[in-house]
């Protein structure tokens, strides 16, 4: 374990193994490729998918997002393993409750979290957009990376060039998660940077 002082008198305990290992190196990609750019990593993902128990489409999305982050924010050091860990915890890589990943990365049916209405230990998060609520202003986390609608509006991106920015697409969601975690120059290659991200 490591102990870091975040402010005078405030200590942050960081367990061993943080940040997690970066995993296998990801091949270089053309971040401006047309179509679904993450598909450039098909062979790499197919070689690892079964052993990692991560669908090929999801693994492509995580690795591509980490590669784009490396280009756009080289000091962030986000690894595809971090994105894969989030994807596993939040939605079993887009397969929670029988959802499936389409070849273009869309998750169907859409994955929604519990109502964030303040009950059962949840925060109460109100949103005025009817499309992301049940009509009562209370929201749910969305998609394979479980974005809160307000966060999605700030960080959502079209990672696979279809003209849509969708939290229900694993490519869009993985790249948005990388952008969110790398925000404000965070360095996820350090224990403190990773734990505070």
Segment roles from a protein language model:
Residues 34, 41-197:
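Catalytic glycan-binding domains that act on GlcNAc-containing polysaccharides
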């Amino acid at each position: 374990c490591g102990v870091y002082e975040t402010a005078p008198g405030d200590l942050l305990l960081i367990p061993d193994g943080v940040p997690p290992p970066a995993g296998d190196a990801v091949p270089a990609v053309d971040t401006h490729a047309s179509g679904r750019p993450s598909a450039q990593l098909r062979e790499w993902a197919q070689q690892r998918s079964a052993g990692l128990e991560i669908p090929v489409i999801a693994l492509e999305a995580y690795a591509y997002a980490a590669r784009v982050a490396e280009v756009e924010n080289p000091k962030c050091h986000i690894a595809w393993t971090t994105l894969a860990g989030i994807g596993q915890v939040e939605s079993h890589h887009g397969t929670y409750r029988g959802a499936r990943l389409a070849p273009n990365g869309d998750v169907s049916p859409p994955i929604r979290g519990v109502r964030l209405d303040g009950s059962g230990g949840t925060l109460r998060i109100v949103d005025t957009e009817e499309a992301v609520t049940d009509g009562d202003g209370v929201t749910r986390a969305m998609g394979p990376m479980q974005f809160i609608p307000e966060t999605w509006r700030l960080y959502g991106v079209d990672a696979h060039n279809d003209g849509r920015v969708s939290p229900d697409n694993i490519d869009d969601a993985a790249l948005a998660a990388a952008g969110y975690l790398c925000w404000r120059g965070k360095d996820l290659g350090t224990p403190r940077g990773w734990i505070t991200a």
